[in-house]
Amino acid sequence: AETPTNPLTDLCDIAALAALAHAHGALLAVDNSFASPVLQRPAQLGADLVVYSGTKLLDGQGRVMAGAVCGSTALVDKVMGAFMRSAGLNLAPFNAWVVLKGLETLSLRVKAQSAAALELARWLEAHPKVARVYYPGLPSHAQHALAMRQQGGLGGSVIAFDVVGEGAEQLRANAFHVADSTRVCSITANLGDVKTTITHPASTSHGRLTEAQRQAAGIGQGLIRISVGLEHLDDLKADLSRGLDTLA
């Protein structure tokens, strides 16, 4: 299970999923990359394995490719042992050191980014050229109560929103216009960085799906995902306004 999900920030009730999985003799693995251990600790809610992309929040500055699988020694050896023996597991020492340095500021970064993301999400929700905002920290999010309970009262640093427009072609053009008009945000698929990133999921993370598959998943051509960094909030609002305010 991935919670929150990419890019629509849907949530899974980890405790409920763990109970369901264990009742049927199954294990539960949770991808906690979007929340980080600062907001959410799946193992304490019953998950058997917790996985992370260390490239994202754990590093926080997009410097390394890294990942982690966390669980009991016995379980990790059972599910990963053959792979580890065949392919190896350890990061290069320098990359491991970089991630360790990132962990030193993880709590400060995640809390600051979550606070900024909430304010930016509120601003986007009120913008006339934004059709819908997806952010667990907003009361309008369908799973807001679960987010507050499961994520320590914070919504995280990732926001998704739909721009206005009629038809797939115009929606895509409008989304590209907003992204291309930014100067502070970095157009990249990475997230969790101290630098705010912006991306168009329909042509990046979900680009290999058919249009019908994207629509079924709720990924429209007008959808934009933002990972909020540590820039001044006024700068981010001005950066996004440049494109949003000039949409037809």
PLM feature segments, named:
Residues 79, 174-178, 236-240:
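Hydrophobic side chains in well-ordered alpha-helices
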Residues 1-129, 134:
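Conserved PLP-enzyme active-site core in the AAT-like
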Residues 5, 196-248:
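PLP-dependent enzyme catalytic core of the Aspartate aminotransferase-like
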Residues 84, 180-184, 241-245:
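Short, solvent-exposed amphipathic alpha-helical segments in soluble enzyme
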Residues 60, 91-95, 150-154, 216-221:
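Short, flexible turn/loop "capping" segments at secondary-structure junctions
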Residues 118-194, 209-215:
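Conserved small-domain helix->loop->beta segment predominantly found in fold-type I
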Residues 98-108, 156-168, 225-229:
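Short, well-ordered beta-strand elements within core beta-sheets of diverse protein domains
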